[in-house]
Amino acid sequence: DSRNCPDGSLFIALKGESFNGNAFAKFALESGCAYAIIDEGEYAVEGDQRYILVDNCLQTMQQLANYHRRQLGTKVIGITGTNGKTTTKELISTVLSQAHNVLYTLGNLNNHIGVPTTLLRLKPEHDLAVIEMGANHPGEIKFLSEIVEPDCGIITNVGKAHLEGFGSFEGVIKTKGELYDFLRKKEGSTVFIHHDNAYLMNIAEGLNLIPYGTEDDLYVNGRITGNSPYLTFEWKAGKDGKSYQVQTQLIGEYNFPNALAAITIGRFFGVEDAKINEALAGYTPQNNRSQLKKTDDNSNVFICNTDLYIISWQPQVISH
């Protein structure tokens, strides 16, 4: 944004349907940017070496983000899924932050622009990164995975959303599974998987799996103990682990596997159980997701997700 250029920053002239970032490059340099990457030479000022001319600014940004990610030793966790990506990402990041310096996607900036923008925020002090990746057409998760190069991954679920972009439910599964395809080829990779979800288990062959769910012998397992209105559950590690009870501020049983995912990843990266429970109990949804709000007459209103364009009712996810 040319209106927000800290001294020494880099301006990249992205284009949209109603704007051309090249037209703002001069203003960005005058506002404090050290350099401006443009892809239309007529916007450069002759003799000013602060302009960097490239073929395509967006592609350059994506390549730069991948290069930057490779220079740092940060372990990267990639997350995708039809629903629950953002809440699960927030829960995972909250838990991991109890013991790590974590970079994570802000809001749901999970597309071809948001993902590289997040990666470019990586700093040497970050030892973990949680990167959310979204898709509305085949090949998009493959493309984003090649930018992110995650070391670990999680697919929250697969459901019948954005079918117009994927063509069919099978297309959704295949596209979300592109994260698994990338990790299957990466040496030393790990996949955190909801063992109760048959769709995910069916496409997880050949992966190093860390499972969570309701079965007693899983890496992390648990059961719901209450949901009126806030989700309460028990969990333990393995068959003989110590059992814990957690009272969350989350609405909806559908958040149970999201919480188990955060516990699983937290334990995998060495967060103490007490710290995990403290983080989950203290987490309050912020993005108009699974929130209980009061009206002026003090009655409760349950907000599922005000990003209406991605809401979908998916009984098949619940039943599997």
What are these regions (language model features)?
Residues 8, 38, 131, 193, ...:
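Active-site flanking residues adjacent to catalytic metal/cofactor-binding acidic residues
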Residues 51-53, 76, 102-104, 209-211, ...:
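Conserved beta-strand scaffold positions in the cores of enzyme catalytic domains, especially
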Residues 42-47, 154-302, 318:
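Acidic, Mg2+-coordinating active-site environments of NTP-dependent enzymes
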Residues 16-19, 286, 305-320:
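Active-site beta-alpha connecting loops in nucleotide-dependent enzymes
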Residues 17-20, 43, 84, 110, ...:
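Glycine-/small-residue-rich active-site loops that bind phosphorylated ligands and cofactors
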Residues 1-63, 251, 271:
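N-terminal leader/targeting and accessory segments in enzymes
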Residues 12-15, 105-106, 131, 248-249, ...:
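Thr-Gly-centered strand-to-loop micro-motif
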Residues 59-195, 199-207, 242, 260, ...:
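Phosphate-binding loop of NTP-binding sites
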